[in-house]
Amino acid sequence: MALPLLEYKPT
């Protein structure tokens, strides 16, 4: 499963 972790990361 490839989840967009970079998008979920709080910048």
Curated annotation (Swiss-Prot):
Membrane topology, from the record: Peripheral membrane protein
GO BP: any one term: photosynthesis
One annotated Gene Ontology cellular component of this protein: phycobilisome
UniProt keyword Thylakoid present: yes
Subcellular location: Cellular thylakoid membrane
Keywords: Antenna complex, Membrane, Photosynthesis, Phycobilisome, Thylakoid
Family recorded in the similarity comment: Belongs to the phycobilisome linker protein family.
Task performed by this protein: Rod-core linker protein required for attachment of phycocyanin to allophycocyanin in cores of phycobilisomes. Linker polypeptides determine the state of aggregation and the location of the disk-shaped phycobiliprotein units within the phycobilisome and modulate their spectroscopic properties in order to mediate a directed and optimal energy transfer.
Assembly: The phycobilisome is a hemidiscoidal structure that is composed of two distinct substructures: a core complex and a number of rods radiating from the core.
UniProt name for this protein: Phycobilisome rod-core linker polypeptide CpcG3
Species: Anabaena sp. (strain L31)
